[in-house]
Amino acid sequence: MDADAFVANWHAEKERLLSAACMAGTECEAKITAMGLSSGQTAQLHDLLGTFATDVMYTLLLGLDGSASLGNDQRSYTLLDEDGSVIAKEGDLEAAAYAWFQEGRAPRR
């Protein structure tokens, strides 16, 4: 796995979480329904949640890369797969995160 594949998994997880949150029968969906929003307002809320999730994941990835702080601490971390191979060198996660979360890179087929 390289930095791009690692970030692609984060992006896929973001999409899965957003889809699951809006599924009927979930606590999140019940709370949104209880708000009594119009369909337009509900769409705006879903858009807001997507923006928030993007910002959170992007910031966390940059924090792991050393390009942003996590809390009050900014440092680079070495990401290893289960075999001990380095997934990303410094700067690799930042570049991949920008492509996926800011430029909207689509999954490769």
Task: Tell where the protein language model's regions lie, with residue ranges.
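Generic surface-pattern signal
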Residues: 12-15, 19, 23, 37, ...
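Intrinsically disordered, low-complexity regions enriched in small/polar residues
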Residues: 8, 60, 79, 100-103
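N-terminal low-complexity, intrinsically disordered segments
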Residues: 1-42, 70-72
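Short, functional C-terminal segments
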Residues: 84-109
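Amphipathic protein-protein interaction modules
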Residues: 40-93
